[in-house]
Amino acid sequence: MKQRNQKHIALLSVVLVPALLLSACGSGASGQLSSSSTAPGSEPAVSVSQPEPEPQPAVTTLRFSATGDNLIHDGLYLQARSRAGGEGYDFTALYESVAPFYKDFDINWINQETLVTDELPPSSYPCFCTPGALGRAVYDVGWRVISMSNNHSYDKGAQGIAATLRFWDDMPDDVVTTGLYAGEADYGNIPIQEKEGVRIAYLAYTETTNGLPTPSDAAANVIYTSQEDVIQQQIELAAGR
């Protein structure tokens, strides 16, 4: 009985070894032994490489607001005078209801309809002039691009033009002004603002200055919408920048 059992054990050993070998070959079919997995007469598998996807251009989104006309008559600056207790001007209340709206924008542009300066006394219709406190209130709301080209640009003649230019030049460096040019030689000096890698050119024109001609001794002048050749040249110049 012992010998028969030994024969059975030996026979099982012979049977198991081929089974293990077959199992090992079978495992190669799953990818571990790919070089020997091609069936006779069949074409070898060809690996097709997929083309690299083209890189997509980065998209920059800027939120822009435009406001006009910021025209300050005597009723408004007298209220501001009263709020300041008779000393100076406080225009804060004028914008407090709309100020939160402008916080949602990256760039805020405004047409400043009246001259802004502390060098000249404030005045109302028909020739406007507004205290400097108004300009500082405009800045505090978030307006940074100031257009000065409109029908009231010449209300105070050459003196008013020079004074309002000095006021805005003294404001923080992030203020951009547009619309007044120091003669024809300055028409190519187009204000450019860069924001998050985007370059923006600002051009501003007016249809009229209420019948007032450009003062002969003015430090700067507007460009009228009728000057189409000049406008076209500025557009082309701005596009190239």
Regions flagged by a language model, labelled:
Residues 21-24:
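C-terminal motif of bacterial Sec signal peptides marking the signal peptidase cleavage site
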Residues 26-33, 40-241:
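Acidic, metal/ion-coordinating pockets
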Residues 1-3, 31-32:
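Short intrinsically disordered, low-complexity coil segments enriched in acidic
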Residues 2-14:
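Bacterial N-terminal signal peptides that target proteins for export
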